Amino acid sequence: MSLVNPHGREKILKPLLLSGQALQNEQERAKSMARVTLSSRETGDLIMLGIGGFTPLSGFMGYEDWKGSVEECKLADGTFWPIPITLSTTKEQADKLKIGAEVALVDEESGETMGSMTIEEKYAIDKSHECREVFKTDDPKHPGVLMVMNQGDVNLGGSVKVFSEGSFPSEFEGIYMTPAQTRKMFEDNGWSTVAAFQTRNPMHRSHEYLVKIAIEICDGVLIHQLLGKLKPGDIPADVRRDCINVLMDNYFVKGTCIQGGYPLDMRYAGPREALLHALFRQNFGCSHLIVGRDHAGVGDYYGPFDAHYIFDQIPKDALETKPLKIDWTFYCYKCDGMASMKTCPHTNEDRLNVSGTKLRKMLSEGEEVPEHFSRPEVLEVLHRYYATLTEKVDIGLQTNTGG
């Protein structure tokens, strides 16, 4: 058996990253182009376009693709796509840019020219409408909503050429990987069914349990962590990487899972983001996506299993990557081990509910972490990290306590 096909009608990866002489030529041309500044989210999206993670997109979306993605989870040509991938700028700058012009795309933090774009469309959007459709709320306290509302007032659509993957390859050497690289690793391992485990938290016992369930039914698991920006109080990617390494070294059979990373910022779009996570994992070669409690959620904006239900609401042929839906998991003292609502007959009094939010709150406030919450080797890494912090970040517990 072979790996799942890349997303889209052509079923081939479409990386937009230039190399060699073509890269040098385009970088030289970009020096004389008008500059458009990229937010952190837009830079991550551009890199994903570059490495083929957002196959089959050829650039930032025009109006019809934006509208279709927002309202119907599909592009203008009917290809399934659940979240808009857009670039914005101010009205003042947009007025100066002509259709057909080429612009240099510059990361706002590093100042690096990340790529170039041919402007094919300029269009204004109803930001609140996008937020209500994608996030199911336009509450500015939602970090994803705030991200959209802070965008420029005009979107620029057009095809891109990508120059750089930023600092990700050097900063996360051996962890950050392109779809072509993960696919080769899976093939070299003889894997055809691969489950992706999405994480933005250090792995606690529930996470470990989910991954081991997937190992039982798939050839292997890609522990695939987000390397881009998160909200305040979340734990940085380098710390999470170290936590995953010690967990894999001490509690997993060698050759059953691979740690990887990808360059996106978190959108916190809950169910819709779960669909995007499955879509780009298909490009990375994964046949399944582990979907647990409150996947990609934040606060109490989504029900604990809304991300399960949304996969039942899309066309059956929308994605080749399928969800592995796993119920609420916890440590049960009477079962004397990890369990789920489907396997444990006991009551809440017998259970230790494990979540990343709870773990961060306990560590941030210097509380003792209960036994069975996380492996001691992982806690040692986390204690070292929290000892370096000079400011305390308040972490609110939500009803769903998404992991």
Swiss-Prot record:
It catalyses: sulfate + ATP + H(+) = adenosine 5'-phosphosulfate + diphosphate. The gene is sat. The keyword Signal does not apply. Keywords: ATP-binding, Nucleotide-binding, Nucleotidyltransferase, Transferase. This is Sulfate adenylyltransferase. Pathway: Sulfur metabolism; hydrogen sulfide biosynthesis; sulfite from sulfate: step 1/3. It comes from the Bacteria. Its EC number is 2.7.7.4. Belongs to the sulfate adenylyltransferase family. One of its GO terms (biological process) is sulfate assimilation. One of its GO terms (molecular function) is sulfate adenylyltransferase (ATP) activity. The keyword Magnesium does not apply. It is an enzyme of class 2 (transferase). It comes from Pelodictyon phaeoclathratiforme (strain DSM 5477 / BU-1).
